[in-house]
Amino acid sequence: QFLENQKSQREEIAFENGDLKIDYPSRTVYFQGKELHLMPIEYNLLCLLAHNVGRVLTHQYILDKVWTNAMESDLSSLRVYMTTLRKKIEKNSTQKYIQTHIGVGYKMIRVTDTKEDSNDEAGA
């Protein structure tokens, strides 16, 4: 369901947020230039958060969009996958990419890119 919508958005080839990059056509994720090996659910979670960067997504919304098997679609499974995803994308970084909103859900934080900041200051 989510992936079908993703494929229809051909104009989005890649997502970049700080050291994190998602290459949609190849379904590949890079962190600090190195390819990360994500399980399909982790990849789908990451893409959903990336498509909604800066917005809090409720637990139920995430479960409805990412899980196809109702048996595994529960809050404890979501927490486990979110923990493993965080470990992979925040492993060697002081930057946090995924923020927990206790009792509500999760959101991806837009990371400030120092290159863009210096360009903005130079142009001002």
Where is each model-derived feature located?
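A sequence-composition feature that detects small, non-aromatic residues
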Residues: 14, 50-53, 70, 82, ...
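A structural micro-motif at secondary-structure boundaries
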Residues: 16-43, 107-124
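Basic, amphipathic DNA-recognition helix from helix-turn-helix-like DNA-binding domains
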Residues: 1-16
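Positively charged, aromatic-enriched patches within helix-turn-helix-type DNA-binding elements
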Residues: 28-81, 87-96, 102
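ABC ATPase A-loop
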Residues: 13-15, 96-99
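Compositionally biased, intrinsically disordered low-complexity segments enriched
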Residues: 3, 101-103
